[in-house]
Each structure stands twice: as C-alpha cells, then as structure tokens.
C-alpha cells in the first residue's frame, strides 16, 4: 500500500516538473478540439488528485490501525505468557488445597474414632472403679466384723501356743537347774577334798599377808595349794550366786505362768490385757547379765516414805578370819535354806558386764573357752588375795542389800 502511494506521489511530482518545463504547444487543430482535450485532462487530473488525497488519508488511518493492532498483538502475547504461568500456579494451589481438604477429612474421621474409643474406655473404667469400690467396702466390713468377733471371742490357739512356749521354757530352765545342781554337788565334793588335802589356814593367812598387788610377778612366790583353794572359793561363790538367781527366776516364771493360766481359764471372752501388763511389769524387774539373771523387786517403803538400803560396811584389811571346812560347809547350807523370797537383790561381781542382746532376753553362762584354764587347775597369774572379800561378808551382802526404787 505504501508503494502505491509513493508511485502516485512520484507521478504527480513528475507531472508538476513537466508542467513547469513544458511550453504550451500550439494546437494543430482548430480551437474547439484543443479546448475539449485540455478540459478533459484538467478534470482527470483533479479527479486523480482527489483520489490520491483520499488514499493518503486512508493510508495514514491504516498505519495507525496497524500500529494499534501490533500493540494489541504484543500485549496479547505477554498476556498469554503470564496467563500460562498463572494457570500453572492456580493448578498447583488447587491440587494442594484438594490434598489439604482430604487430609482434613481423614483427621476428622480419626478424631471421631479416638473420641469414641476414649468414651468407651472411660465408661468401662468407671464401671470397674465402682465394682472395686463395692468390693473394698465389702472387705472392710468383713475385716471389721472379724476384728469385733476376735475381740469378743479370742482364739484359743494363741493361748495354747503361749502355753506350750512357756512350758518349753520351764522345761529348759528345769534342765539347766538340774545340771547346775549336779555341778554344784560335784564342786562341793571337790571343795571338801581340796580342804582335806590343802595346807592349813595359818599358811593361807601368811600368804595373804605376804602377797600384795603392787609387787611384781618375780617377787611373788607361787603356792600351789593356796592358788587351788582360792580358785575353789571363787568358783564356789559364783555357783552359789548363780543358783540363787536361777531359783528366783524360776519362781517368777512360775508365778507368771500361773497368772496366765488362771486368766485364760476365767476370761475367755475378753482380751488378755492384765496378764500381758503383769508380764511386762514383772519382766522389767528382771536384770539379765552375761552370766547371771537377778530378780529385783521394789522394797517396801519406810514410815518416812523412803526405801531402806542396808549398805554393809566395807571390810577392812585387818578383818581377816580363818574359816574351817565345817564353817564353809555350814555357810553353804545356811544360805541354801535361807534363800530370800521377799525381793532381796543379789549384787553382781564387778568383772561381769551387762552385755545381753535384749533387756528381757535369757542369758545363761557362756561355756569356757579353750584358751582359758580348766576349772581346778593352777593359773599362771597370781590372784590378789587381799582384794577378795570374805565369805561371811558376801553372804550378808547377798541377803540384806536392797536397791532404791
């Protein structure tokens, strides 16, 4: 189209140039024909010129339209490119939204199932708890009724077991007492033999005056008969004290068993409170040591409200008397006949410590060790005879000394 417009312009310009240069020729024809041809040419020229102007206007309008269409085309292409990217993003977002919705529905279903299971389990646990509470109440009532029935009717089996245990203890004590009596009789015969075969008492007194604890072992002159008699006297005194203490302990146990038997026979429908209290009160009066078991009663009060204590005077070193065999045996028989039953307390020797495991446990004399010297044999170490109290003083202290309550 542009080429056509340019051709028209070139034609017009060429005509204008020829018009300037051309010289109006003289028509060869006569006047009318030349005028008519000239007029036809002028009209044709005017017509061509008008059409050329119209074509130029149309050409400019078409150019503007082409430019607008080109701009639209470029915009459409850009829109297509952007729209393709947006569609992909929209598709992705839609797929993600769809997956999220599916997951939400699945989670809702799972939550409903879990809530349903929890409600069922809670219901079952509540039912089990109620049943357990009912069982617990039943067991409590049964236990309370059994306790009431036991308090009203105590079982006889416990009394029988206690009775059997007490009988066994009494039997064991009787056996121990028999063995100790036998040993005491054997020791008595040995003591008589030792007195008959031993040296006279004057030599013993001389030995007591000569021997002193402050002297060394090399200065002591050992005397076989003197050591033997001193050992026999010491063993005699220990056995006598052990026998008297065991006698008192057996009396206390017999008294307690008598109380238990009488209370069990009379009061079968009530709890044995008094007997147990008596047993505990009497058991607190038993002082058990490593070798002896002494019984201690509270002494009767004097008119001024104080308990008497007969403290014997300590023996002086000069109060040394000679006892013959007859006097020693007579003191043994007198003390056996005059065993105090009114609560006399027998003092323990200072060398025996209180090493019992419990306060109310029985502790009998421990058997002699292999390292110790056998009974009746001479000891290598000389005993300080001046520190040993005389027999009449020990007997008096054994019978008359009472502790304060």
From Swiss-Prot:
Disordered: annotated segments: 357-377
Statement: the UniProt record of this protein carries the keyword Protein biosynthesis: no
Entry GO terms, CC: cytoplasm
Region (Homodimerization): 1-198
Keyword Kinase: no
Positions where Phosphoserine occurs in the chain: 331, 366
Subcellular location as annotated: Cytoplasm
Phenotype when changing residue 237 to A: No effect on interaction with TBK1 and IKBKE
Role this protein plays: Adapter protein which binds TBK1 and IKBKE playing a role in antiviral innate immunity. Activates serine/threonine-protein kinase TBK1 and facilitates its oligomerization. Enhances the phosphorylation of NF-kappa-B p65 subunit RELA by TBK1. Promotes TBK1-induced as well as TNF-alpha or PMA-induced activation of NF-kappa-B. Participates in IFNB promoter activation via TICAM1.
Quaternary state and interactors: Homodimer. Interacts with IKBKE and TBK1. Interacts with TICAM1. Interacts with TAX1BP1. Interacts with CALCOCO2.
Entry protein name: 5-azacytidine-induced protein 2
Source organism per UniProt: Mus musculus (Mouse)
Gene name in the database record: Azi2
